[in-house]
Amino acid sequence: MSKEHVYEIGGINFKGYFAQANSNEAPCVLIAHTWAGRDSFVEEKAEELAKLGYHSFAIDMYGEGKIGSSVEENSSMMQPLLDDREELAKRVLGAYEYVNNLDLVKSNSIAIMGYCFGGLVSLDLARNCSELKGAVSFHGFLSGPEENNGEKINAKVLALHGLKDPMVGQDQIDSFSNEMTEKNAEWQLHVFGDAMHAFTNPEANDPEFGTVYNQKADQRSWKMFTDLLKEIF
């Protein structure tokens, strides 16, 4: 099967990246990208997951596979979706439905993981898709939409957070914890004491901006994630 898949949502073409596991009918893990777009970072994660026996699909939240090249460009692509969580949910649900209909993917056996902005995308899919099996956020934004649908969250939820992340304050943590509890989710929040934002990205090295790679947090969070996949599937 080809790596790049074009799927349409609301008249816009989106370009996802599919990494195929050795087995034919297998579960699939969606990967939601950072604010930079569907770049090589998430494609490499997709290939890693395929080696572990899971099909993986790096979704495109911006359309046409757009990738930003600066902080300003990344922000300009991400912000409209943060401002319109209904549109954000529509796009990630569209990706879920596309993948769920692929012959190679075991029906209704899908989880999602995401980084930074993609962490929020992952959690929003859990908030809006009752069939989702798991949702994992790596140093992601935790705040829910202003319009709370109040529906129970069926997916197993794992949030992996750096204590020194300046982009996610205690207010987000408290709000997330209350929401997950109110929605009867099976949820976990792990805090890495010495980690900042983007702790899984080896290229992150900007303490003033709050983004710094942390090898131990990277390795430990990946193990927690893959252990959850084994439990789910």
Provide a role label for each language-model segment.
Residues M1-F233:
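N-terminal cap/leader regions of alpha/beta-hydrolase-fold enzymes
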